[in-house]
From Swiss-Prot:
Protein name: DNA ligase
Phylogenetic lineage: Bacteria, Bacillati, Bacillota, Clostridia, Thermoanaerobacterales
HAMAP family on file: DNA_ligase_A
Organism of derivation: Thermoanaerobacter sp. (strain X514)
Gene behind the chain: ligA
UniProt cross-references to InterPro entries, sorted A to Z: BRCT_dom, BRCT_dom_sf, DisA/LigA_HHH, DNA_ligase, DNA_ligase_AS, DNA_ligase_CS, DNAligase_adenylation, DNAligase_N
Function: DNA ligase that catalyzes the formation of phosphodiester linkages between 5'-phosphoryl and 3'-hydroxyl groups in double-stranded DNA using NAD as a coenzyme and as the energy source for the reaction. It is essential for DNA replication and repair of damaged DNA.
Positions with a binding annotation for Zn(2+): 400, 403, 418, 423
EC class of the enzyme, as a word: ligase
């Protein structure tokens, strides 16, 4: 068969099966058969690149990472909806509508708790997708939206239209994603809506493609060459074109039927596989919508009814303290199990010790618990009239319950944090940070390998990395002879890193790379840093009382001193390497870097400037002398041009390093 014809046939087959699987949930072929069709299409398109088109289903896998999202002005403003929280407010809305246009039919729909987007199709082909933004201008996230398989890349008809929909993440996918993030020591998403928003706004579409996002289309914003009388007709048309439309859209003759349907949706809420935060009421007649019009913020023909967060009464059986991956100690209430929003709740967050004091929460109290989309519900109120006198006050520990290290609460902060390098709760994240590029830069030591090392008991702290042997690493998954030797060489090479890189790698709370440089430059050795007192640190530039307290508390912890000693015994450098200034050619000069540099990393360019007496800052101001511009610069370039700051490229920078054209 002619390649062009075969590609056309494969696209039609894949689009058909995508629709059966992702929209109708009625697959006709196995995953393997589908994968074979997709593989053949990709191979043919690679062989004949001139036949590749933007609407091909092969384009869903995700393109190249973006530097930033481009702003996009919506074809039709994406207005928000006015809210109603009671039956009375719904009846007020109905009265206003009927006063303006007479009796009306309404449509009641689910209000999906996700991220609103606009999709534009030209002659049946998906061309642009954007987030809501401020309602007038959003962000162009077309490449990311193409990875959502329930969004058709080509419609049934060659029609030009604009639709609005809600991108969301099903609860099961959300739970799976958080499980994976927890294993990698990454921060958890608070709820499916946050996960959906974070996933859609990834600069790398390949990340979005892995996140299992879905969409429901709920409104036809604009269409060329066709007319419809009602909202229901538009939904039926969109369904025929291949869109996954909002699953519940009930036509109601009057406000009483609307209120009844909203209550039915409330009862259904917990059984749905995705989150909703209410119901939307819309006028069905499109001509009457035109008459009703809109305010600057919202249409007069629609309103959102928001369900209140469900609250239940239960008892606090105990209060325990959990340690997060950043070392934060969080008090958690152990509750008498109670059913809320479709799940049995047996624990609730108490946030921090101030929250407990403010609410006067005690062990044994009867409390009101609320679940409002968070992973863990929260205690919102104490029923003090039910106290018996047997309740016990809770005292926040000053030692970490996981490792016994000192738990420090810095002045002005609500959170108490563990200072222990050995703390199992924060070990994965701590080692990932220690091995990162700006710290010890151990090439090849990523989260997956660190996870294996920890789970097999081969390491228990950062110092153990320097005692790993060939036979330890060769047993790990995906580690062959060459990769083991490369990793051992990378670990060995990291021993020579400068003192500030090691200090930053320890992950001391509030001590970033810049502060680590200031401290290392002043004290010269790790021993001097460990012996220094609070006031010794506060005298340094850019080191405030909180940072000083944090670093003093860190080195007051015995287990941390032992790990430093272990690092020292392994041969890790503990001194500020005396590089000295290469020259003073940039003395008194301030630089700003913007865009991706080709010849060096930002860190390398920064060091080159500082070694020659210059200073690097993050923002452009009148005090800036030079802006070094790389590929795809951001807004800093524009500001530099407006202020008349000298702009240099890498070639000019290299000439300046030689002492030329300064």
């Amino acid at each position: 068969m002619d390649p062009k014809e075969r590609i056309k046939e494969l696209r039609e087959k894949i689009n058909y099966h995508n629709y059966r699987y992702y929209v109708l949930d009625q697959p006709e072929i196995s995953d393997y058969e589908y994968d074979m069709l997709m593989r053949e299409l990709i191979e043919l398109e690679e062989k004949y690149p001139e036949l590749k088109t933007p609407d091909s289903p092969s384009q869903r896998v995700g393109g190249e990472p973006l530097k930033e999202f481009e702003p996009f002005t919506h074809v039709v403003p994406m207005l928000s909806l006015a809210n109603a929280f009671s039956e009375g407010e719904l009846r007020d809305f109905d009265r206003r509508v009927r006063e303006a246009v007479g009796d009306v039919e309404y449509v009641v729909e689910l209000k999906i708790d996700g991220l609103s987007v606009e999709l534009i199709y030209e002659k049946g082909i998906f061309t642009v997708g954007s987030t809501r933004g401020d309602g007038i201008v959003g962000e162009n996230v077309t490449q990311n939206l193409k990875t959502i398989k329930s969004i058709p890349l080509r419609l049934k008809d060659d029609v030009s239209l604009v639709v609005r929909g809600e991108v969301f993440m099903p609860r099961a996918s959300f739970e799976k994603l958080n499980e994976e993030r927890e294993k990698l020591g990454e921060s958890l998403f608070a709820n499916p809506r946050n996960a959906a928003a974070g996933s859609l706004r990834q600069l790398d579409p390949k990340v979005t493609a892995k996140r299992d996002l879905d969409i429901f289309i709920f409104n036809l914003q604009k269409i060329e060459g066709r007319k419809f009388k009602t909202h229901i007709e538009t939904l039926e048309f969109l369904n025929e074109q291949g869109f996954k439309i909002i699953p519940i859209h009930k036509k109601c003759s009057n406000i009483d039927e609307v209120i009844k349907e909203i209550e039915e949706i409330r009862n259904l809420r917990d059984k749905l596989p995705y989150d909703i935060d209410g119901a939307v009421v819309k006028v069905n007649d499109l001509e009457k919508r035109e008459i009703l019009g809109q305010t600057a913020k919202d249409p007069r023909w629609a309103i959102a009814f928001k369900y209140p967060a469900e609250r239940k009464k239960t008892k606090v059986l105990d209060i325990i303290v959990q340690v997060g991956r950043t070392g934060a100690l969080t008090p958690t209430a152990i509750l008498e199990p109670v059913a809320i929003s479709g799940s049995v709740v047996s624990r609730a967050t108490l946030h921090n010790e101030d929250y407990i004091k403010e609410k006067d929460i005690r062990i044994g109290d009867t409390v009101i618990v609320q679940k409002a989309g968070e992973i863990i519900p929260e205690v919102v109120e104490v029923v003090k009239e039910e106290r018996t006198g047997q309740e016990r006050e809770f005292v926040m520990p000053d030692r970490c319950p996981e490792c016994g290290a000192l738990a420090v609460r810095l002045l002005g902060e609500a959170i108490r944090r563990c200072t222990g390098l050995n703390c199992p709760a924060q070990l994965l994240r701590g080692i990932i940070h220690f091995a990162s590029k700006d710290a010890m830069d151990i090439e090849g030591l990523g989260p997956a390998i660190i996870n294996q090392l920890l789970s097999k008991g081969l390491i228990h702290n950062i110092a153990d990395l320097y005692y790993l042997k060939y036979e330890d690493l060769i047993q790990l998954e995906r580690m062959g002879d060459k990769s083991v030797k490369n990793l051992l060489n990378a670990i060995e090479e990291s021993k020579t890193r400068d003192l500030d890189r090691l200090l930053f790698g320890l992950g001391i709370n509030l001590i970033g790379s810049k502060a680590a440089q200031v401290i290392a430059e002043h004290f010269k050795t790790m021993d001097n840093i460990m012996k220094a007192k609070f006031e010794d640190f506060t005298q340094l530039p850019d080191i405030g009382p909180k940072m000083a307290r944090s670093i003093v508390s860190f080195f007051a912890e015995k287990q941390n001193v032992e790990i430093i000693e272990k690092l020292k015994n392994a041969g890790v450098n503990m001194k500020k390497l005396s590089k000295g200034k290469v020259s003073n050619i940039f003395e008194g000069k301030t630089f700003v870097l913007t865009g991706a540099l080709e010849s060096y990393t930002r860190e390398e360019a920064t060091r080159m400037i500082e070694e020659r007496g210059g200073k690097v800052t993050n923002s452009v101001s009148k005090k800036t002398d030079y802006v070094l511009v790389g590929k795809d610069p951001g807004s800093k370039l524009k500001k530099a041009q407006e202020l008349g700051i000298k702009i240099i490229d890498e070639k000019q920078f290299e000439e300046m390093l030689k002492g030329e054209n300064i």
